[in-house]
A protein has these predicted regions:
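Active-site and adjacent substrate-binding regions of carbohydrate-active enzymes
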Residues: 1-190
Length: 190
């Protein structure tokens, strides 16, 4: 988390796209990496592989800091020219599920190299739609176990409660996206 480094990376990407006559594509999270709201909640430089191997508890994640930094980075990316991809659940402020036991892992990467303990399943957990844990937090129409377990408290990130709150991450994303839509995409960068 370094403002100079972020500026340097964005500037290089923008200049390179300009040289090539193309546009940029920005992304903070996807189905193969730790959710950015979790990554940004860890201070300092750390090895993601070692973090997974250590059951993802060392260093500890500062959830509040992660969400604040994720919000700042999202606002920055959505202000930049080009396309921005949003990964499912980031608009809710979802954290990485770091509590999936080995016996419930689904990721082929985990089974190919079990000694490494690496899995991408923590960012692939079904989204919470309702605050109630019933029916996999509303992800299903029946009371069934989802293919990956949802962590306790997942309902606090649910779409329903977030939709009803002016202070929620979902509402913030909606406001930012409306603002982005109103920007002049053809304006030169200064």
């Amino acid at each position: 988390w370094n403002a100079y480094k972020v500026h340097e990376l964005a500037e290089k990407a923008l200049l390179r796209a300009h040289e090539l006559g193309s546009s940029n594509t920005w992304v903070l999270s996807n189905h193969d990496i730790i959710r950015h709201a979790t990554r940004f909640g860890v201070d300092g430089t750390f090895d993601t592989g070692k973090w997974f191997k250590a059951n993802r508890f060392n260093p500890k994640v500062n959830v509040k800091q992660g969400l604040e930094r994720a919000t700042a980075m999202t606002m920055l990316l959505l202000a930049l020219p080009g396309s921005t991809y949003l990964y499912q659940g980031e608009e809710l402020g979802l954290q990485e599920n770091m509590e999936i036991p080995d016996e419930l892992m689904q990721d082929p990467q985990f089974f190919r190299n079990p000694d490494l303990g690496l899995s991408r399943d923590g960012c692939r957990v079904p989204l919470p739609w309702t605050a109630s844990a019933a029916n996999a937090y509303g992800f299903s129409t029946r009371d069934v176990e989802p293919w990956l377990p949802q962590p306790d408290g997942w309902g606090s990130y649910a779409i329903g409660p977030e939709h009803d709150s002016d202070a929620s991450m979902l509402t913030l994303y909606q406001r930012i996206l409306r603002s982005r839509k109103s920007l002049d995409a053809e304006a030169p960068l200064e």
